[in-house]
Amino acid sequence: MEEITINIDKIKINDDWKEFLRDEFQKKYFLEIKKQYLNAINQNIIIYPPANLIFNAFNLCPLKEIKIIILGQDPYHQPNQAMGLSFSVPKNVKIPPSLNNIFKELQNDLNITPAKSGDLSSWAKQGVLLLNSILSVEANKAASHSSWGWQEFSDAIIHKLSNEKSGLVFMLWGNYAKSKEILIDNTKHLILKAAHPSPLARTGFLGCKHFSKANEFLKKVGKIPIDWKIV
């Protein structure tokens, strides 16, 4: 059997992020992720998001422009939902319950009318990294790739962004996301914590005012605030 290796040049991620994450791509755990991925594909297992969208969060959010990180857990596992951006779904796909609550909070906080589309690409293009901790999932099986090693990759990204950038906003929603707080230097960055926006979570997300708080912080550190309206 042919030995599996990592050819960094072939990873579908833009050049700035590729350089930023080069060391991670060369680590043993990333090779293990690739092995598991190829093994699943060889068994004709359906994986979301599609291969060309796995690194979509990075390809839409320029590294030089990054301002905010919104951390999700793993991709949606139903057909046509996952697009490589945490909480986001493509245009013309029914808006999931968690995203509905995010839109409700935007209305409460900034008087933004809830969008008809759940595609958050316009946020990403302004510098919002919509990062899932786990970057892939088997169809119809939530958290099915949680043992693959993706968390090591996303943890390294959070830690590296914290160390090498300043004046970022990290939005941590729910206990899983809040557990990543230890990776972030709170003397350089703003950490905003709330309950998960899922309707299954106990109260604590609605009323958090994270979107206005983030923009106030960005202005304070001399950055252009985010236009949270969905385009």
Swiss-Prot record:
Pfam families: UDG. GO terms for cellular component: cytoplasm. CDD domains: UDG-F1-like. It comes from the Bacteria. It catalyses: Hydrolyzes single-stranded DNA or mismatched double-stranded DNA and polynucleotides, releasing free uracil. Its EC number is 3.2.2.27. It is found in: Cytoplasm. One of its GO terms (biological process) is base-excision repair, AP site formation via deaminated base removal. The active site is at residue 74. Keywords: Cytoplasm, DNA damage, DNA repair, Hydrolase. Excises uracil residues from the DNA which can arise as a result of misincorporation of dUMP residues by DNA polymerase or due to deamination of cytosine. Belongs to the uracil-DNA glycosylase (UDG) superfamily. UNG family. This is Uracil-DNA glycosylase. The gene is ung.
